[in-house]
Design a protein with these regions (language model features):
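Alpha-helical transmembrane segments of multi-pass small-molecule/ion transporters
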Residues: 1-323
């Protein structure tokens, strides 16, 4: 059973893409999930599961080698937001797409980065700690950067986004860490259940993002019309994220496994969180404002998967857990 669960979890990126395909061709499957607060609850559950995987010891790496963790956080919140803003301007994206694209670029790293780091034999402990740190920093940085960079397109309610991030990220993660601290035996018995639940929840959110865009008048035609430009934008964004993240680590003289981890944390974004924030804070621009998260999720999975495979082939097997 554990092998089956591990197989299911390791194919997380594939299930997300499958959900997009189902949502595009059979939107009724996910349409109900796009209504009300289902997406918010689903992302909160994902963040709760992330919190359950963390304990206070998870942050000990900060005290062992804090500079590399700080560098990963700086890379996350400079390379991606600025790249997203510049790409949106350079490609002349319509305002709804530009705002959605910038939200993706301003979000913290996603847990999928840990999977890419694991497969690619990057420094896994740095990846896990950096994902947690960027998620916590995102409580402030995501609303602030979205306000600064997307405010030229549409009015941005930074306080509203802050409330959303606190609700979706801070409270569930804090609750998860508390449960892990208070009831470690229970969390240990859960095994891989948290990762399985997270995979299902993120896949449901992915399908629920595209479904309402498809059923609107001319929805499929609009998505197809956006496809070429959005695939280009997403490829540039995540390609720059991986490339500049790796280069930044090299410039500061870090070993290859640390550079790979920084690249993963910079290049992979939390697309599910971006889609939910877009839905909650820009309802008048839905569902188009949620469309960029679809293309970004597909391209970051594709680029990350190719890099992980290449890194795995070219990297001797060794312990990649310690920072």
């Amino acid at each position: 059973m554990n092998k089956i669960l591990s197989w299911f979890i390791n194919l997380c990126a594939l299930w997300i893409i499958v959900a997009y395909v189902i949502g595009y061709f059979w939107p009724q499957v996910f349409l109900w999930f796009s209504r009300g607060r289902w997406m918010t609850w689903a992302l909160s559950i994902v963040m709760l599961c992330m919190g359950l995987s963390l304990d206070l010891g998870s942050f000990s790496s900060l005290f062992k080698q804090p500079k590399v963790v700080v560098l990963a956080a700086i890379s996350q919140y400079t390379v991606m937001p600025l790249s997203g803003w510049l790409i949106a301007m350079a490609l002349g994206l319509p305002k709804e797409l530009a705002v959605g694209f910038i939200i993706v670029a301003c979000c913290p790293g996603g847990t999928a980065s840990n999977l890419i780091a694991y497969i690619g034999r990057a420094n896994l402990s740095l990846s896990v700690v950096s994902t947690a740190i960027s998620t916590i920093l995102g409580i402030v940085m995501t609303p602030f950067l979205t306000k600064v960079l997307a405010g030229g397109y549409v009015p941005v309610d930074a306080w509203g986004m802050l409330r959303s991030v606190v609700e979706i990220v801070l409270l569930p993660v804090a609750l998860g860490v508390f449960i892990n601290w208070k009831y470690p035996g229970f969390v240990k018995k859960m095994g891989q259940a948290g990762a399985v639940i997270s995979t299902v929840a993120v896949s449901m959110v992915s399908g629920a993002v595209i479904a309402p865009a498809v059923v609107m008048d001319g929805g499929r035609e609009q998505i197809l019309a956006f496809a070429q430009k959005m695939f280009l934008a997403a490829t540039l964004l995540h390609g720059l994220g991986f490339g500049l993240g790796f280069l930044l680590g090299k410039v500061f003289g870090y070993e290859r496994d640390l550079c790979k981890a920084i690249a993963c944390e910079t290049g992979m974004q939390n697309g599910g969180l971006a889609a939910t924030l877009a839905k909650n804070n820009f309802p008048s621009y839905m569902p188009i404002v949620g469309v960029p998260s679809i293309f970004c999720s597909i391209m970051q999975s594709a680029i990350g998967g190719v890099l992980a495979s290449w890194w795995r082939i070219t990297t001797p097997e060794k312990n990649s857990l310690a920072v």
